[in-house]
Amino acid sequence: MHCFVKQKNPFKTQRGVRSMAMKSFPRTEVAGVSLPRMLMGTNWVYGWSHTGAAADRNIVRMNSNREAIQQMLEAYLAYDINALMGPISDKPFTYDAIHAAEDKTGKGIILIDTPILNVDDTPEGRREAERVLDKVQKGGATFCLIHHSSAEQLVNKNKQTIERLPDYLSMIRDRGMIPGLSAHMPELVLYSDKNEYDVQTYIQIYNCMGFMMQVEIEAVNKIIHEAKKPVMTIKSMAAGRCSPFVGITFSYNTIRPCDMVTVGAMTADEVHEDVEIAMAALEHRRPDLEGRNSPNRTEILQ
């Protein structure tokens, strides 16, 4: 696997994230498309906290609206982080925020949609899958990565195949989109490569805590490094179970230069902090961040 890396653009840091110079985030290439090595996540917009219903509802109250999403998109776009991942076509209110952010910044956003498909081996199941893919295409997605809950129904571990997957990949190609897999199950990466399916990239859960990972961290690290195509990692902060500094730093220092880390945020300020942490990890330096608040903050926490 050849890893494509654009030129490094170091930050000219100052005290406090919001005042630092905003440079373009490093990029990679997937199926001929230039992508930032940080992808915009959507769990903290759509209400998938992985903690509980109360947290889910709080996210929805805060962020499932055009204004909040637009502010976060603009924060990412300030660093040319211009690729958004998630089941976007299933959340149509997102499009208003996307178009508003694009109009305001003059920068286009690449959509990486992860639709849930009916993979029943029946005429009606196929028609329903086609209707969903038509909706994804209409929404303007560049990449269409079949959701893990759909793709994993097709896995045959005995044969080391993903049954009937080429049919769905062809449906995606026929609609002018680049096919891939939202692969929570590590075997999806292995079987895609082994059988040379038209899978141009794969999502893979990867974090320093092993959160939601189906095998050991070391095993997934090996899968990522041996993958034939670039990997889009998700859950880098284990859904808030580790700090951004720990989670993001681990991810960028243990994947390849062609791979990506998906990072979601609750606010635009969090975007700026996360980008600074990521840039510091890539440049092997300490991130320049403001100290955390504390009831009696001592000098060591300044």
Task: Name every feature range the model reports, one short phrase each.
Residues 20-43, 47-52:
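N-terminal amphipathic alpha-helix/helix-capping segment at the start of soluble metabolic enzymes
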Residues 43-45, 89, 114-120, 149-151, ...:
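Active-site beta-loop-alpha junctions enriched in small/polar residues
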Residues 62-159:
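Active-site beta->alpha loop and helix N-cap motifs at the rims of alpha/beta catalytic domains
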Residues 40, 179, 231:
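Conserved, mostly hydrophobic/aromatic
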Residues 139-142, 173-175, 194-203, 226-230, ...:
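Glycine-enriched alpha-helix->loop->beta-strand junction motifs that scaffold or abut catalytic
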Residues 2-19:
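Short, Lys/Arg-enriched N-terminal segments with co-localized hydrophobic residues
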Residues 28-37, 56, 61, 67-85, ...:
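Structured C-terminal cap/extension of enzyme domains
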Residues 90-104, 152-168, 186, 212-221, ...:
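Active-site-adjacent beta->alpha loops and helix N-cap segments on the catalytic face
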